[in-house]
Structures are given as structure tokens and as C-alpha cells.
Amino acid sequence: MALVFKSIGAHKTPPCTLNLASPALYHTRVTMASTITHPPPLKDRKISSTRRVRTYPLAPEKAEIFNSMHGWVEDTILPFLKPVEESWQPTDFLPDSTSDGFHEQVEELRKRTADLPDDYLVALVGAMVTEEALPTYQTMLNTTDVIYDESGASPVPWAVWTRAWTAEENRHGDIVNKYLYLSGRVDMKQIEKTIQYLIGSGMDPGADNNPYLAYIYTSYQERATAISHGSLGRLARQKGEMKLAQICGTISADEKRHEAAYSKIVEKLFELDPEGTMLALAYMMKMKIVMPARLMHDGKDPDMFQHFSAVSQRLGIYTAKEYTDILEHMIARWGVDKLTGLSGEGRRAQDYVCGLPMRFRKVEERAQAWAENISHVPFSWIFGRRV
């Protein structure tokens, strides 16, 4: 029995397929109206005891594929991790609080950040808030069939990877959070509330607890965050803030290494199960690679994610173009266009995925126009100033 995915032919293609991961692509769809709802207060939410129906539960023989990969994961994926003693830590880049010159170091940092423009600060805060929601991302992997951490300290390689990946990622939000706090340029209490709201809201990437879908999603997102932090570093360098450029570049390098690991997993799945992996990729693209911080809000602006996304698009940090670039990279990286021996459904899935980049390119200008034309709004992160 194969891993069951709904027939590609049985679905209508979403109009222009604009409801995908790039914030701008997501918002160009049909109207510019908000599509993200402000979560109701906890006391007003209806809690159902019925679990959401999973559309694509993992078949036993598919689970066996992942169980059979333990040795491969240990030999091939775990080496992507860096030993803790060889890893950078936030204190390597920030003023030393034990030093007699701490106050002078902080003052110097504040001078360097004084000229960072508001739109850049909004983009940097949004990226940091996304990183700080790390508990949500670990939860996603630990609710995924077969690869989840059964005990919380499981020695199974899949679980070892997830814990160590989380530990490496934890430094990213930590360092930028401390940097922003020391800069004095932003309203930390509003930022902290945004982080708490986001973690409390969670996320549903549409992976249905299915490891095929989960690893495709993480491959995509790790590359997206590598691009975003690389762009933030480039802009910081242009503004003369070399320390921040170094911080962003260091984070981006981590994300590239993590992307390489997740992409390697999907590459192996294409080798072991080309049909099932092809159908999974097509399904994930139909579902859209939703941004992990899509439910971001600060308790005031229910459309904060849209507004933050527009700022990032305008600055060229992460745009509709990058979204399409990632898809093209993945198609080439996994040899999707060269797969042979697929069933009729598999070939339809292959044609669908390989045809998406051309369709996305046609709407990039519309996505940029959306970002340029959206009204500038006040951001609580920068004391209500408009961006």
C-alpha cells in the first residue's frame, strides 16, 4: 500500500497559484484584503476534543522507510551539526557584561545603530520574532510520525537531530534579541508580547504529521531564512553597521548548513521512494509553504504579518522572486524534472511542480506592486512610528 496522496488531477489548480509562501504572493491573491485573523482571547475560544482529521496518515511501509534510515541519518545528517564547544555563542558578538568597558561598548553599539532606518528595524525585529518562536517549530517535528522524539531524550537519530538542530537555532533569536535590547531603538516590551502571542498561536504548515511533508517544508524554510538573514546583513553593511552584518551573516551560514541537511534528507527520500516523494512535493506546493510566523500579532494589529511582509518585500529582504528562486533551486537540487519511472499520477505531479516557476514569475511584478502600494502603518515595535 503506497503513501496515499489525493490525485493531482482531482484538484483544480488554485487561481494563479498565488496563495503560497512568499508574503507578497500570499497577499496578491484575489484581493489585498487581510486573510489572517486575530486569534480570539483564550477564554472565548471553543476547545474541541475532536482531533483534526489527518488527510494523509503515514502508511506502515512508508514508516519503515524512515526506520530503515537510522544508520544513514547518523552517518550523513548528524555530521552537519557542530559540536557545542566549537560553536559560536551570542556573547562572542555582544558587549561583555563582565568587562570594565561594558558601558562604553554599549554606548558604541548605540552610536552604530542610531542611523538604522525604521523600515530596517521592523524587518530585523520581524525576523527575530520568527526565530524566537522556536518552541513551535520543534513541536511540529515532534508531532510528526516516526521521526518524533518518543521520550524527550530518545537516542534515535531523527530525535537527536531535532534536539540538536533546535539547540543551534536557539542562538539566532537570542543574539538578535539582546542586540536590539542594547540598541535602545525598539520597544522591547511590545516585541516580547509579540513573541509570546506568536508562540501561543502556534502554526499549522499543512504537513499532517507526515515526515515527507515536514522535511520538504523545513528544506524550503531553512533556505528562505538563510536568504532573509543574508539580505539583512547586506543592508546592515550598507549602513555601516559591520557588527550587525557579521551577526546576520553568521546566522545565515547556520541556516544554509541546516538547509543542506534537510535537503539531503529529501534527496534520499527521492532515491528510496521517488513516487511518494514526488506526490508529497506536489501536495505541499498545492497546500502552499506557509510562512512560520503567519499568525504574528502584537495584541493591537491583527494584520501585523501582512504589514511586516510588505516592509520586507519593499526592502528586498525576502520577496516573491526569492520564493520562486527557492522552488527552482529545489527542482534542480532534487532532480525533479529528470525523474523517470513514475506512475501517471506521479508524472502529473512532476509536470505540476515543474510548471510552477514560470507561473510564479508572471506575478512577481504584481507582488512588488502590492508591497509598494500597501498603506504605511504604525508599528508598536518602533513606538508607533509609521513604516
From Swiss-Prot:
Enzyme class, spelled out: oxidoreductase
Gene3D superfamilies tied to this protein: Ribonucleotide Reductase, subunit A
Domain of life assignment: Eukaryota
Effect annotated for changing residue 214 to G: Broadened fatty acid chain-length specificity
Family to which the UniProt record says this protein belongs: Belongs to the fatty acid desaturase type 2 family.
Reactions accelerated catalytically: hexadecanoyl-[ACP] + 2 reduced [2Fe-2S]-[ferredoxin] + O2 + 2 H(+) = (6Z)-hexadecenoyl-[ACP] + 2 oxidized [2Fe-2S]-[ferredoxin] + 2 H2O
Cofactor: Fe(2+)
Binding site residues for Fe cation 2: 169, 222, 255, 258
Protein name: Acyl-[acyl-carrier-protein] 6-desaturase
Pfam families xrefs: FA_desaturase_2
GO molecular function, one term: metal ion binding
Main location class: plastid
Range annotated as the organelle transit peptide: 1-29
EC number: 1.14.19.26
Cofactor note: Binds 2 Fe(2+) ions per subunit.
Function, as annotated: Delta(6) fatty acid desaturase introducing a cis double bond at carbon 6 of palmitoyl-[acyl-carrier protein](16:0-ACP), producing 16:1(6Z)-ACP. No activity with the coenzyme A ester of the fatty acid. The position of the double bond is determined by its distance from the carboxyl end of the fatty acid. Low activity with several saturated acyl-[acyl-carrier protein]s, including 14:0-ACP and 18:0-ACP. Requires reduced ferredoxin for detectable in vitro activity.
Pathway named in the protein's UniProt entry: Lipid metabolism; fatty acid metabolism
A GO cellular-component term linked to this record: chloroplast stroma
